[in-house]
Regions:
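Oxidative protein folding and maturation machinery
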Residues: 1-104
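Active-site acidic short loop of glycosyltransferases
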Residues: 28-29, 110-112, 186
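Generic structural signal for well-ordered beta-strand positions
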Residues: 104-105, 202
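Conserved redox-active cysteine motifs that mediate thiol-disulfide chemistry
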Residues: 110-111, 118-138
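Alpha/beta-hydrolase fold active-site loops
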Residues: 113-114, 190
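Conserved segment of the thioredoxin-like fold in thiol-based oxidoreductases
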Residues: 136-177, 182, 186-189
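Thiol/disulfide oxidoreductase modules built on the thioredoxin-like
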Residues: 166, 173-221
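Sec-dependent signal peptide cleavage junction
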Residues: 221-230
């Protein structure tokens, strides 16, 4: 199965490169621009596409001012400028807000390990992770702070939040998929980032399976962490 996945990934990347090469000479249409935006995001966030960045730049160079000012044009520029936050780097001290409008900075939570949980209300695995995250928070309050950050728009975030009772920080950066989640290079949710008490990125992971987050946190936090899935 792993070998088939690798083959599929390789073929998808090759198709991307060939399409971008063709796009350099094709007329710029709305569909062309939408496709360029999708590929720009892939190049920014997935290692297998990184080599095609020069092709994205060449295609972007063909855009006139109205095209660059379109939503897709702005998206391409955003992803071309995006610098991915890697493990070992300091996490940016971004501003977030809660459902009641209270403003926070990530630095407000320093002093304990910080688990960032990127989620969406339409994501099944995100919802499935809630019971385990709740246990983790209850058992490890002394050493760990959990901060959930939505990838939804504010209206959807509030709607979904009304259906769940979070016992931890449930926040929004107001930027959806172009917010902090993009800067970590994630292209799906749930996605998790563990920060040191000083705010350094210790580890990143994407996806959820029962017990995986519990095991992962113990691996990095060590003896001060209490497992909740035996």
């Amino acid at each position: 199965v792993k070998r088939l996945q690798q083959l599929r990934d390789s073929l998808e990347a090759e198709i991307c490169g060939r399409e971008l090469d063709l796009m350099k000479d094709l007329p710029v249409t709305a569909d062309w621009l939408s496709r360029l935006s999708r590929y720009a995001r892939a190049v920014a966030q997935e290692e297998r596409y990184r080599g095609y960045r020069p092709l994205i730049q060449d295609c972007y160079g063909r855009l006139d001012e109205p095209q660059r000012n379109s939503e897709d044009g702005k998206s391409v520029l955003f992803y071309l400028a995006l610098e991915i936050i890697e493990e070992g780097m300091m996490c940016p001290d971004v501003e977030l807000f809660g459902l009641d409008g209270t403003r926070y900075r990530l630095s407000d939570f320093r002093g304990k390990y910080i688990l960032l949980d990127f989620w969406s209300g339409s994501c099944g695995p995100c919802k499935a992770s809630i019971p385990e995250l709740e246990k983790i928070v209850q058992e490890n309050e002394r050493c760990l702070t959990l901060v959930s950050i939505t990838t939804d728009g504010e209206k959807s975030w509030r709607k979904y939040s009304d259906k769940h009772s979070f016992v931890w920080h449930n926040l929004c950066d107001g930027s959806g998929w172009k917010g902090l989640v993009a800067r970590f290079g994630f292209n799906g949710v749930p996605a998790f980032v563990l920060l040191s008490p000083e705010g350094k990125v210790l580890s990143k992971r994407i996806g959820y399976g029962k017990g995986i987050i519990d095991w992962w946190l113990e691996k990095f936090i060590g003896a001060s962490y209490t497992r909740v899935e035996k």
